[in-house]
Amino acid sequence: MSSQTKFKKDKEIIAEYEAQIKEIRTQLVEQFKCLEQQSESRLQLLQDLQEFFRRKAEIELEYSRSLEKLAERFSSKIRSSREHQFKKDQYLLSPVNCWYLVLHQTRRESRDHATLNDIFMNNVIVRLSQISEDVIRLFKKSKEIGLQMHEELLKVTNELYTVMKTYHMYHAESISAESKLKEAEKQEEKQFNKSGELSMNLLRHEDRPQRRSSVKKIEKMKEKRQAKYSENKLKCTKARNDYLLNLAATNAAISKYYIHDVSDLIDCCDLGFHASLARTFRTYLSAEYNLETSRHEGLDVIENAVDNLDSRSDKHTVMDMCSQVFCPPLKFEFQPHMGDEVCQVSAQQPVQTELLMRYHQLQSRLATLKIENEEVRKTLDATMQTLQDMLTVEDFDVSDAFQHSRSTESIKSAASETYMSKINIAKRRANQQETEMFYFTKFKEYVNGSNLITKLQAKHDLLKQTLGEGERAECGTTRPPCLPPKPQKMRRPRPLSVYSHKLFNGSMEAFIKDSGQAIPLVAESCIRFINLYGLQQQGIFRVPGSQVEVNDIKNSFERGEDPLVDDQNERDINSVAGVLKLYFRGLENPLFPKERFQDLISTIKLENPADRVHPIQQILITLPRVVIVVMRYLFAFLNHLSQYSDENMMDPYNLAICFGPTLMHIPDGQDPVSCQAHVNEVIKTIIIHHEAIFPSPRELEGPVYEKCMAGGEEYCDSPHSEPGTIDEVDHDNGTEPHTSDEEVEQIEAIAKFDYVGRSPRELSFKKGASLLLYHRASEDWWEGRHNGVDGLIPHQYIVVQDMDDAFSDSLSQKADSEASSGPLLDDKASSKNDLQSPTEHISDYGFGGVMGRVRLRSDGAAIPRRRSGGDTHSPPRGLGPSIDTPPRAAACPSSPHKIPLSRGRIESPEKRRMATFGSAGSINYPDKKALTEGLSMRSTCGSTRHSSLGDHKSLEAEALAEDIEKTMSTALHELRELERQNTVKQAPDVVLDTLEPLKNPPGPISSEPASPLHTIVIRDPDAAMRRSSSSSTEMMTTFKPALSARLAGAQLRPPPMRPVRPVVQHRSSSSSSSGVGSPAVTPTEKMFPNSSSDKSGTM
């Protein structure tokens, strides 16, 4: 069976949805028709009663014949009306029943002429006229609220339609990405089978690079499609979750409307009608009861009918008469797209944190709303009781008018002094209408609040059920998660960026032109962070954040860092929102130029917001394209944020209040108080109608805001951003030609990617260019030549052709005399079994507090915290999948982190070379004295190299030395305390081996090379080739595996290397670089590379 017959098409799903919406719309229209018909029926009834009593008052002067005719006249009229049919169908309403009994009793009336005429004319008819006015007024107010309810229902259904289409779109993209991934896997398998059939002996030596290239291309394509599939799958999951949540909210809102709101709406239409009508009839009964005893039997029947005037019974009767109109419709069902089997909210790991945070926010919001709504309900009940007291005043007794001792004049005076006097009428009517107005205001507030609680409660219950199942599933008590885990995307750190133009308080256009970022990093990162963790945050952009944290985030952005890449557990949402507002508020040129202020304000003259779209669009078209792109991105985000106003309480108007003064500055000479309201209205209009105002991506290229964003773990490099920069350590000309080409052996390399140098010392080259390498300057840089110019070449952008592990061999030879070697690992086995295990933290042993400020690498250098799961080093040739995008030259530093350990991690050959390199250059201080001597040596060296910088360098070194000594003493104390607490003999600890005094101290520090620049000189390539087969499988390290007794199988992971700019070194000094007087990196620089001597290095 084909996929067309299995799954519904998008058009069919949309057609079914539109049909269901059309049916609901029809029901809503019919409801108002029914209520309007009921109101007209009541008005007709009241008009008939007024006419009846008016005629009866006139006819009371006549005799019983006229009264009999009157009764017969209305009886015949009723027999031909619809109410007569209702009576047959047992749908007789209580007011109609009273009317029937009155007519029946009228036939017995033949007496009481003048008194009854006075009472009917001055009392009963006036009451009926007031009731008619009340019916019309109450129906109009109820209709307004009903229309608002209908609009809310249609708005909810429209939102459900939008979310459903978004879900369909992302799911289609996920299916497409999955098919492409399968196609890539088939190509890889086909290529693998094809290469296996050929004999290695029959292939020529020059054909092998071509096969490797084809394999790498296929692997690149597979990895790229794998990443695309993972990203689309995550977006699809988020879109489906939103769809299901909106689906639950929509069904809950519709169900509440049909079950509760319609009933309450009918109650509003009936408010006071039955009570007022009862008073009128009781007035009539009071007059009639004083008539002759012969009428008592018939009047008792009427009294019983009046006592049975019941608004609830009539309401149920009306709803039973029109059961098809008032019955709730069918619930909206989840419409799976293209066979999607997941029909519930997914709480897997990529979205579990977000859902949990959203659940707690909903819980807090619901608690507040329920308290507020309960208070409103109490006020509503009290107001209703007051209204009932007003409407049930017992002022219908007119027995005094029938006293035989009184004259006609006394009867008139008594009537004038009673309730129906004009003064009392005006006073009572004013009080009643004022109370009614307050009641309707509170009723509207209560209905809106209860609707909001119903929707949020539905989401809350669904999230509670989902998260509860997820927790139980993790404990192994219920079924596994709905979706199988998909391959995760390799995380890549956001690069560091430093530009010549200011980010804050500068020109945004100049910054965008300089950086190449279509959206400034601070805006893009803050919006992404709020999208992931703050859409449900109450009062976002209105509640201020911590000023200290705002300044910290701002300073990080100004340094070119992105502090929000992986800090969702540390950053406050309100502080991030404050940074976003701070950035736009401090721009040198506001987002909306002051020159167009009057033009924008003039659009407010159009009362309809939809009519303002075209004038605003024509004004914004005149702005620069880069500004329009930023505006489009920002206002799309604000519109998305306003869609969660039920939870975050930030509708478009509230957002406009927050962003109006930020985005549109009021020019000098204008009254800020009077203009601010107009500014807010302009911003509100743009937020609501941003799609119609700003050009589409086809009309204007640039990044577009996406509602479903990936988290920090999946954060990829933006296609609109530029690679980060590395500041120079030495600002001298770094491209000085080498004095001799024969001092070192030249190594040939091929460029894997295009690279543009960001300083005079860095070389620029194209992909496939041939490069000459002199020696390895650091982990990430080579000294080399291209097109006759010497300079630095990034290691991650090249493939070394004829160096096969020579760099690792030279370091291994140097390390043999200094450190004990690690276990020998087979190269092939390590390449096959290079598996990533979950990262652990040593928080149980107190390392979080000891190493909270400084993380020590195996070579003794302090390294910043990095996100786990990614590696900044390129894999060795022929091993592992290659990366499809150029690696960044600089990594983004962040706050210190605990030391991670990997269980069962088998390191790749390239990482073993990095570990060997780190251990070769390490320096162990035997005691604090040696540490102080090293610091003083560094201070002396720094003063000789940078004597022109002044005395502040020595003060900085002293402060740094004091800080280092304090940190080391604290670390030693806590680690020794841990050692004393452990009863089992522990294996040597990495940190203890680094910090504790050694029994056999090494030779003088000056005898060891302090920098890799002194050892990376390949003089005998043949010898390196001879040793490559054996030394490539070795992993040289200064320390033994840490915590081997505590964590079985735990092995140190090589720390991620950050590209540190090597110092300037000419080739003429390479042969003597291992001497004491060489300008190498001092021990303190290796421990803390971010000190004063490295301030101009990588940020």
Swiss-Prot record:
GO terms for biological process: regulation of postsynapse assembly; signal transduction. PROSITE patterns: F_BAR, RHOGAP, SH3. Residues 809-820, 1089-1099 have a biased composition (Polar residues). GO terms for molecular function: GTPase activator activity. Residues 352-392, 952-987 form a coiled coil. Residues 470-493, 809-846, 861-911, 994-1014, 1045-1099 are annotated as: Disordered. The modification Phosphoserine is found at residues 817, 820-821, 837, 858, 954. Residues 506-694 form the Rho-GAP domain. Keywords: Coiled coil, GTPase activation, Phosphoprotein, SH3 domain. One of its GO terms (cellular component) is glutamatergic synapse. SMART domains: FCH, RhoGAP, SH3. Residues 744-803 form the SH3 domain. The record marks 542 as: Arginine finger. Pfam families: FCH, RhoGAP, SH3_1. CDD domains: F-BAR_srGAP3, RhoGAP_srGAP, SH3_srGAP1-3. Residues 1060-1074 have a biased composition (Low complexity). Residues 19-314 form the F-BAR domain. The F-BAR domain mediates oligomerization, binds membranes, and induces plasma membrane protrusions. Homodimer. Forms a heterooligomer with SRGAP1 and SRGAP2 through its F-BAR domain. Interacts with WASF1. Probably interacts with ROBO1. Interacts with FASLG. GTPase-activating protein for RAC1 and perhaps CDC42, but not for RhoA small GTPase. May attenuate RAC1 signaling in neurons. This is SLIT-ROBO Rho GTPase-activating protein 3.
